[in-house]
Amino acid sequence: MTEFQLPKLDFAPDALAPAMSAETIEYHYGKHHASYVANLNALLKGSAFEGKSLEEIICGAEGGLFNNAAQHFNHSFFWKCLTPNGGGRPEGALLAAIEKTWGSFDAFVAAFSKSAAGNFGS
């Protein structure tokens, strides 16, 4: 059986500081995400989902198998969304839509930050 793997980070653990510390990255990546991958691989052995893609597992499994597969997917996506230099200010149609809705990019950032701080999830 091919096992799922913890993806390689595209940045050093300290590259996101001060927004996210190396300690936070190492804990979240090296402990949380690594545990989801290990649990997923253990739960797959002998199951009907052994050998299936991550997407097939997420769409068909339940309980712990679903939870660990979904967390592996979510975290893998999360790491790809992070970059040491940030995304910067958008341009073109996206910036126009932001300015139309929020009045300015800075107002959007403030509203987004406030909303994000009030939510919990992974």
Go through the PLM ranges and name each one.
Residues 1-122:
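Feature for soluble, non-membrane regions of globular proteins
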